[in-house]
Amino acid sequence: MAEHEQVHEHVRVAVIGSGFGGLGAAVRLRREGITDFVVLERAGSVGGTWRDNSYPGCACDVPSHLYSFSFAPNPEWPRTFSGQEHIRAYLEHVADTFGLRPHLRFDSEVKRMAWDTEQLRWEIETVRGTLTADVVVSATGPLSDPKVPDIPGLDTFPGKVFHSARWDHDYDLAGQRVAMIGTGASAIQIVPSIQPKVDRLTLFQRTPAWVMPRVDRAISGAERALHRALPATTKLRRGLLWGIRELQVQAFTKHPNELGFVEQIAKRNMGAAIKDPALRAKLTPDYRIGCKRILLSSTYYPALAKPNVDVVASGLSEVRGSTLVAADGTEAEADAIVFGTGFHVTDMPIAERVVGADGRTLAETWKGGMEALRGGTAAGFPNFMTVIGPNTGLGNSSMILMIESQLNYLADYLRQLNVLGGRTALDPRPAAVRNWNHRVQERMKRTVWNTGGCTSWYLDASGRNTTVWPGTTAEFRRETRRVDLAEYQVLRPAPAQVGAKAAEADTGADTGADAEVSA
């Protein structure tokens, strides 16, 4: 398809994004007998986060047999925690196995989409043209748009600058003085991967992280053969991994003080590698473990102990040419800056492009904080669902479990529309959205994410946790098993518009009636 070719089509469902959420939605649509759908992807291939993040050492911190679809088990995972290239290959395999290729529209970034209150459908403008859809599933994910802090003087830096999610593989770090900004999940994988080759590595750490050892190993050929021959063993392995994490949830959500034992394990992990008391003090968090995402690595601390690594216990505040200045005044020279500063999680950029029934964008609606009914649907945005929406994140388990629960909800949502018949839309009642989010926030009050004494990317600008689910994945699955129509307004075309259709066919008259709302 030529660039900017104009496409005008109407589909039953448009899915935005082709990571785990988007491909999972596509598989579920086909299983529901829906083939009239497209998957709009801004890049040139599938993979989402696992396509965009290809930095050295990139891997998942959830065991691979749990970080995969239940309907697409993979007996060939090479390691307990497989690397980015294997996860991306798995997603390509899913696209092929389930016949998703004909539905994929690559290089089709959504520029704007708006709800048509007369036609009861979404008009979607992409870089390749315009299409309309009865239902839109936004599966862009919270880790899709990198966040780079606005550092004074950064434009004066003469060297190389890039974000971990936009790694420049053409730039050779060997022999360079490199500054790593941030100490999150990406940084703890990058640091040990580049430390042996760089001349000097300076880590700017605003807040230290709790790091637990990562018990990773190669999965033997015999194990893989067993999983191929007896698929039930793969299911059993997955079930055990899931069950262990479900049991851990109580400590995060109801009894944070029980995490003290886990803190001692993390401190021993640090002490085994970091012998310098001053460096240990820099790396020891002053908040409860679990308040920020617990990181897994058995190589991070050993790398920080190497003689060519400096840890600055302060965030980067200014750049003066090739000199980087921390908030505490510490200075360091660098040839390259790598930002491991996370993503736009609580202010997802896609929200600025989605215009609802009242003419406001989703970003404007969420200005006071993200809210959605059961993590997926927002009031004023009919027939629109977000996969991995507000308060669907997890602090200790696999997001694929949450995605599959949301896909159950999506499937029932579409069934309800079919039962209602005709041109119909469902719009969450504001009271239902408020009630759901009140329940979530009340449960959040006791969790370690709210009481642990830290500021994390789970929190929005007002300090409210709009990211994490304060319960087990089994609880969320029960909450999203069925759509309760009492929580929705049913929208239909106004009678005048319906009655005018025959006349419109004969005269070409344009009807402009508003939609009728049913209880």
Swiss-Prot record:
Residue sites binding FAD per the record: E41, T49, W50, R51, D52, D61, Y67, V110, M399
Protein name: Baeyer-Villiger monooxygenase
Function per UniProt: Catalyzes a Baeyer-Villiger oxidation reaction, i.e. the insertion of an oxygen atom into a carbon-carbon bond adjacent to a carbonyl, which converts ketones to esters or lactones using NADPH and/or NADH as an electron donor. Thus, can convert bicyclo[3.2.0]hept-2-en-6-one into the oxidative lactone products 2-oxabicyclo[3.3.0]oct-6-en-3-one and 3-oxabicyclo[3.3.0]oct-6-en-2-one. Is also able to catalyze the sulfoxidation of methyl phenyl sulfide (thioanisole).
Transmembrane regions: none
Species name: Streptomyces coelicolor (strain ATCC BAA-471 / A3(2) / M145)
Binding site for NADP(+): A59, C60, D61, T183, G184, A185, S186, A187, I188, Q189, R206, T207, K292, R293
InterPro entries: FAD-bind_Monooxygenase_sf, FAD/NAD-bd_sf, Flavin_mOase-like
Family: Belongs to the FAD-binding monooxygenase family.
PANTHER family reported for this sequence: FAD_NAD(P)-BINDING DOMAIN-CONTAINING PROTEIN-RELATED, L-ORNITHINE N(5)-MONOOXYGENASE-RELATED
